[in-house]
Amino acid sequence: MGFFSKKVNYPELGADNPAAGQVQEVEQPLKDLMTQVSDPLEVIPSDGYAYVFIGKPPKKFGVAKIEEGQVQSFVAAAREKGLDQVKIQKLNEKFRDAYEQNMDAQRYTINVAGKEVVVTPCKELVQEVNQIMNSM
């Protein structure tokens, strides 16, 4: 890490880590997402799905869910459910709070399609994001 660099160097995610298999399950949709956004990605894997923080959480970011080979952004899901901008903003604040509460979670990096992606195998963060998504 350079003197002026804000990028954190996380250890590489080993193939023996269960999170590596979880990321592999969503690798193709993750690659598809990478062609649509140029922002950094942080994957929070779980069994059968993953959440992706897009951008630079906890400041400026978006959230997407990868499940059954599909990527759906939080904003798109919220609009489908008819939520207004005020409610969406409140839920975004909850995502920020959940992320900040889990800042100490172990993070790793993995190479996907030639790009470095951060992986955060944190069950607590998955549970909190699930609660927020289910509250829509």
Question: Where are the regions that the model predicts?
Answer:
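Membrane-inserting effector segments that mediate pore formation, membrane fusion
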Residues: 1-3
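N-terminal topogenic membrane-targeting module
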Residues: 5-65
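Low-complexity, intrinsically disordered regions enriched in charged/polar residues
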Residues: 17-20, 24-28, 85, 119, ...
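Charge-rich, solvent-exposed alpha-helical interaction surfaces
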Residues: 22, 26-29, 33, 90-94, ...
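Surface-exposed polar/charged interaction patches
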Residues: 32-36, 40, 98-101, 105, ...
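Intrinsically disordered, low-complexity regulatory segments enriched in Ser/Thr/Pro
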Residues: 59-120
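Glycine-rich, aromatic-bearing surface loops/beta-hairpins
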Residues: 113-136
